[in-house]
Regions:
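Short proline/glycine-enriched turn/loop motifs at strand-loop junctions of beta-rich domains
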Residues: 7-13
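Surface-exposed extracellular loop regions of Gram-negative outer-membrane beta-barrel proteins
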Residues: 29-31
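Residues that flank catalytic or metal-binding motifs in active/ligand-binding sites
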Residues: 12, 27, 39, 52, ...
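Conserved aromatic beta-strand anchor motif in extracellular beta-sandwich/beta-rich domains
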Residues: 16-20
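The feature marks proteins involved in alpha-glucan
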Residues: 1, 25, 35-118, 123-130, ...
């Protein structure tokens, strides 16, 4: 089966709306509060739903309804769509990559200095049709260039999900899924493995300090400040047009 669990306190009802990718029909399943923690809502659906898109329907005490993507989703729809996606279990094995990473980490960079090549995947290179390279195509295009130019490391601007193609990726909407612009999580794992195979260190930018204000994501998740700062004067990050996390809450920092 398929289980859904969501932390969302101070609301009246929660449901999960799941869309079948074959016929695009949506089914709505009501969630129940956890018997030991009323801030957590859950439901178990007795069949597999790999590939289904889904979002949560949250009802406030005043009857207002709104929809949210899953903060912990492992995959997302391709923009401009915003639903989360139930991803298949990964078939990728890290055993060989772990050994190769240790060899990279054990290098003495006093003898061979680090040379880091930083890039944004979406603007580094495009396909002949003007589209984005996927992670596998990036591996075949970028790694030979890095080796030829003598760089020791690649640093990639944020690869977590974000709404705008024009963005560098610093306005995050989901922290547990690589953006679907460039392929699947297994495609990304392939790229990481190829870097390790070629003894190239890899740095992935990750932005835990602030998050996107888009209404389908973390902002005002239960109708009020939940993931963001409750104190209005500390909530907004005007330099980025984002919201700051409330690090006073254990559920947020965990």
């Amino acid at each position: 089966g398929t289980g859904f669990v969501l932390w969302v306190p101070d609301v009246s009802h929660v449901a999960v709306a799941c869309t079948n990718p074959e016929n695009m029909e949506e089914a709505v399943y009501q969630m129940e509060q956890h018997p030991q923690d009323a801030t957590v809502w859950q439901v178990h659906i007795p069949h597999k739903m790999i590939g289904y898109s889904y979002e949560y329907i949250i009802e406030m005490s005043n009857g207002v309804l709104f929809r949210k993507s899953d903060p912990y989703a492992q995959a997302s729809e391709l923009r401009p769509n915003t639903k989360s996606v139930i991803a298949p279990v990964s078939k990728h094995s890290w055993s060989k990559t772990v050994l190769q990473r240790k060899k990279i980490q054990n290098k003495d960079h006093r003898e061979k200095p680090m040379a880091i090549y930083e890039l944004h995947i979406g603007t580094w290179k495009r396909t002949a049709q003007g589209g984005f390279l996927n992670y596998r195509e990036l591996a075949s295009e970028l790694i030979p260039y890095i080796l030829e130019m003598g760089f020791t490391h690649i640093e990639i601007l944020p690869i977590t999900e974000h709404p705008l193609d024009e963005s560098w990726g610093y306005q995050t909407t989901g922290y547990f899924a690589p953006t679907s612009r460039y392929g699947t999580a297994d495609d990304l794992k392939y790229f990481i493995a190829k870097c390790a195979e070629n003894k190239i260190g890899l740095i992935l930018d990750w932005i835990p300090g602030h998050f996107c204000v888009d209404e389908h994501a973390l902002a005002l998740f239960n109708g009020g400040p939940l993931y963001e700062e409750e104190r209005l004067e500390r909530r907004a990050n005007p330099d980025w047009g984002t919201l700051n996390f409330d690090v006073q809450k254990g559920e947020v920092v965990s």
